[in-house]
Amino acid sequence: MRVSAVAVAAPASGSGKTTIATGLIGALRQAGHTVAPFKVGPDFIDPGYHALAAGRPGRNLDPVLVGERLIGPLYAHGVAGADIAVIEGVLGLFDGRIGPAGGAPAAGSTAHVAALLGAPVILVVDARGQSHSVAALLHGFSTFDTATRIAGVILNRVGSARHEQVLRQACDQAGVAVLGAIPRTAELELPTRYLGLVTAVEYGRRARLAVQAMTAVVARHVDLAAVIACAGSQAAHPPWDPVIAVGNTARQPATVAIAAGRAFTFGYAEHAEMLRAAGAEVVEFDPLSETLPEGTDAVVLPGGFPEQFTAELSANDTVRRQINELAAAGAPVHAECAGLLYLVSELDGHPMCGVVAGSARFTQHLKLGYRDAVAVVDSALYSVGERVVGHEFHRTAVTFADSYQPAWVYQGQDVDDVRDGAVHSGVHASYLHTHPAATPRCGGAFRRTCGLQYSTSVTALRKAGPEIRSGVTFAAKGVATRGARSPRLRSPLALMVATRGARSPR
């Protein structure tokens, strides 16, 4: 069954897409709909707010990361059990990854994704400082690309009743229906930092209150019936299936611990789904305050903002030691960006896990963009020469030890011949954010390594002298016992890693 969608776009960043999209998700849910939320592009932060509003995981649709052919199946997978989808766009409507020649349509734009799905676009226009000019703006966006259908406009930050009247007249002149008019209000402002909004998990209770405020404002000022009436989709793809994606894998029991909590909030829902499909039990733990779950066979350290919590991460020396010992035993450890920073010897002078020899520091230099990466060496995840498109998103720098083995070399239009990350034994750590659906073999390979390289390493260490064994006591225990588990985190991040059973945020 096809599930209709609307894509919420804007002429430019800063127009209020996230506010309107999140409020629309919440208002539709409040009206009795089951809403599937999506974000165009690789962004991890906005889906956290979407998840709070929808009560189910926020997901990403990025044809640059996963390719055009997977957008329809990932959409079909994400809308399962829903009756409508809201897709928040990225940047301006036609903005995306610009090709080396320029001039061609940008890949991964909101218009690109909307066209792939046959979804109509609702344009959010920041009305501050303009009135009749809105007609020219809407005319241009409506006629620029025949593959993009603008079904209506939501006017944001409207100054007064008179201002709204003039704006509506301008929209009529352009032939674009007005679906809502949002007044200027400070209650919808969300805190930001250098990489966008403060994450919903970090913002905590205030994030939930902000989502409630967005929901109330959209419910009051947007014609939901008109939004539903204009929704549509031409996508008729079979849903992406993680079981089919990972293929045949080892089925012996294995526990994969995924870092969560305030410091590790960047992750795609499909990652945990693929690990489960490969036969793993996925358990969250918070490195700020918890230890590894008993029986942990492998660790995933996703992205986030560890530089905001360096002292707290360093203070939990028990879990740092456990991760170090697990890695020393040959267990698979997959770390992206924040995970890499957590694995090095120190971050801004604070001791970290010491798994990767090197030090990291916060800088003022933003590294942001897609990367065409080539695997430099065989690892628990990739084969040498394997090509992956990923995303870099940080303001830190790592100085590796001279003897390190890099994970990737970046090639292509944005950066060329730049080496990133480190690989040794079962550890694969780098700045590169990847989408698991684009490289499903990795999930199975990572899972299989739990039962091969790890068990072999622990057996060898058991035979070693006590001075060596003392450093891997937890790792050996992890193989022998798989009974008790630490409590699952009670946080909105559970929605982001798709823990068993969709549930509303607490």
What do these predicted regions represent?
Residues A250-Q252, T265-M274, E281, L368-D372, ...:
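C-terminal and late-domain segments of enzyme folds
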Residues S131-N248:
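Internal gly/pro-rich beta-alpha loop/helix module
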Residues P306-L381:
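Cysteine-nucleophile active-site neighborhood
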Residues K39-V40, V178-A186, E281-L288:
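Beta-strand->loop->alpha-helix junctions that form or flank phosphate-binding loops
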Residues A460, P487, P492, A498, ...:
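Intrinsically disordered, low-complexity proline-rich tandem-repeat tracts
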Residues A254-N316, R321-L326:
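Phosphate-binding active sites in nucleotide-utilizing proteins
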Residues V458-R462, P466-K477, S491-L493:
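N-terminal amphipathic/hydrophobic targeting modules at extreme N-termini
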